Amino acid sequence: MRALIQRVKEAKVIVDDVITGEIRQGLLVFLGLGRDDQLENGKKLIDKILKYRVFDDENGKMGWNLSQAQGGLLLVSQFTLMAQTQKGLRPDFGPAMPPQQAKVLYDQLVEYAQSQFDHVETGIFAADMQVHLINDGPVTFQLEIL
């Protein structure tokens, strides 16, 4: 399971000209699910994201987490994060979780995130989404739970 997290000034997801999720300051998280990923590992990753200190504190250091920064969380499923790219000129998506199974796990992870944090927005699983964001920094990290 991989998460690409970006600190943003604002972000939104649009599907069929409708905004499905929108935040102001916060974290935009692209979430990739692998074949063997489980709910418990996903919960650990969500917990880490929520506690990860990537916002400037009163001293200008990355000392605040999402809650302390009073930010929002925008979760977007992105199976392409699981691609194998070491060989050849075309990504191999074999390591990604099959879509039906991934939707169940993604929905469970969204539900878990909502139970742990007040301001969670999402895209739509497997939809053709347009993601608009204003990066803050830019500050981008890839987190992985095996």
Curated annotation (Swiss-Prot):
Listed EC numbers: 3.1.1.96
Assembly and oligomerization: Homodimer.
NCBIfam families, A to Z: D-aminoacyl-tRNA deacylase
Native organism taxonomy: Bacteria, Pseudomonadati, Pseudomonadota, Gammaproteobacteria, Moraxellales
Reaction(s) catalysed by this chain's protein: glycyl-tRNA(Ala) + H2O = tRNA(Ala) + glycine + H(+); a D-aminoacyl-tRNA + H2O = a tRNA + a D-alpha-amino acid + H(+)
GO BP annotations listed: D-amino acid catabolic process
Functional summary from the UniProt entry: An aminoacyl-tRNA editing enzyme that deacylates mischarged D-aminoacyl-tRNAs. Also deacylates mischarged glycyl-tRNA(Ala), protecting cells against glycine mischarging by AlaRS. Acts via tRNA-based rather than protein-based catalysis; rejects L-amino acids rather than detecting D-amino acids in the active site. By recycling D-aminoacyl-tRNA to D-amino acids and free tRNA molecules, this enzyme counteracts the toxicity associated with the formation of D-aminoacyl-tRNA entities in vivo and helps enforce protein L-homochirality.
Top-level division of the source organism's lineage: Bacteria
Keywords linked to the UniProt accession: Cytoplasm, Hydrolase, RNA-binding, tRNA-binding
Motif (Gly-cisPro motif, important for rejection of L-amino acids): 137-138
An example Gene Ontology molecular-function term: tRNA binding
Name the record gives this protein: D-aminoacyl-tRNA deacylase
Coiled coil: none
First-level EC class: hydrolase
Keyword tRNA-binding attributed: yes
Record GO cellular component, one term: cytoplasm
Localization annotation: Cytoplasm
Domain writeup: A Gly-cisPro motif from one monomer fits into the active site of the other monomer to allow specific chiral rejection of L-amino acids.
Species assigned in the record: Acinetobacter baylyi (strain ATCC 33305 / BD413 / ADP1)
Similarity comment: Belongs to the DTD family.
